Regions:
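Hydrophobic beta-strand signal
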Residues: 62-64
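Aromatic- and glycine-rich peptidoglycan recognition patches
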Residues: 52-55, 76-107
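Intrinsically disordered, low-complexity
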Residues: 1-10, 99-107
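Catalytic cysteine-centered active-site loop
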Residues: 6-59
Length: 107
């Protein structure tokens, strides 16, 4: 819910709110609201997370993209995620199929 509430906020590289986000800053702060500490790096979030198969994705799981991993979003269900995409765009809901999928973790 926290991440969804940031929809429309601008992307800012290295930012972790409150008015701008990068992808790992958004996931880091969203999960901190649930008492989970994550590093501010998509690659490190993947490296330290509990890996799960794509077939077992549940809302709230973190989904990762590219090789090497350079993007992360929060899975919403129905093949969609909320994420901070890149400069010039804003936090948005997108299909996870729009980028090369690399894996998932459950914090």
């Amino acid at each position: 819910e926290f991440a969804l509430a940031q929809s429309g906020d601008r992307y800012v590289w290295g930012a972790s709110g409150p008015d701008g986000w990068d992808c790992s800053g958004l996931t880091m702060v969203a999960w901190s609201k649930a008492g989970v500490s994550l590093p501010h790096s998509s690659r490190m979030q993947y490296a330290t997370g509990n890996k799960i198969p794509r077939s077992e994705l549940q809302p709230g799981d973190l989904v990762y993209f590219y090789s090497p991993i350079s993007h992360v979003g929060i899975y919403l269900g129905d093949g969609r995620m909320v994420h901070a995409p890149n400069p010039g765009r804003r936090v948005e809901i997108s299909p996870i199929s729009q980028m090369p999928y690399a894996g998932a973790t459950r914090p």
